[in-house]
Design a protein with these regions (language model features):
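Enzymes that bind and transform nitrogen-containing heteroaromatic metabolites
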Residues: 1-164
Length: 164
């Protein structure tokens, strides 16, 4: 199963040029708990934000760059490589370019809905026409920011993108 996991604001924003504009320890704990099984796939910019791989998971970086990755990270040249991992859950963790590419293959979305607009410059793709919400948590607040956890399931079959 391919899952995208992200925190998005009311405009589907995920980050500004300076990074993620909210600090939500509860969301970080949720992310760590949900992604402990399976493997992680991240884009180059997200990889550069990590000083070390996420513990206990295979950490793949989607890149066409042939430069060696830091210890604990594995290269993936195309999302089609996910087909070679059919027995594992796959967690796509960003960034914006990778989310846009991977959403056509996604079975589920695990979204933290940040209930305010942070005027982001990087965005999660539109998902409302292809997915239906099947779980929603209660509203929470940390550091003056309200948010809630939602899970969405695809209502049509995932597509194989011929461009990846």
């Amino acid at each position: 199963m391919i899952r995208l996991i992200a925190a998005i604001d009311t405009s589907r924003g995920i980050a500004t040029d300076k990074g993620i504009p909210w600090k939500l320890p509860g969301d970080t704990a949720y992310f760590e708990n949900e992604t402990t099984t399976g493997l992680i796939v991240m884009g180059w910019a997200t990889y550069n934000e990590f000083s070390a791989p996420l513990h206990g998971r295979d950490n793949y970086v989607l890149t066409r760059d042939q430069s060696p990755l830091r210890s604990g990270f594995l290269p993936m040249t195309t999302l089609a490589d996910l087909k070679s991992q059919p027995h594992q859950d796959v967690w796509v963790i960003g960034g914006a370019f990778l989310f846009a590419e991977a959403i056509v293959r996604a079975d589920e979305l695990f979204l933290t809905q940040v209930l305010e607009d942070f005027h982001c410059t990087k965005f999660f793709p539109d998902y409302h026409t292809g997915f239906v919400r099947f779980a929603q948590g209660n509203d929470q607040e940390e550091n003056g920011v309200q948010y809630r956890f939602e899970k969405w399931r695809r209502i049509t079959e995932p597509q194989d993108d011929p461009h990846t």
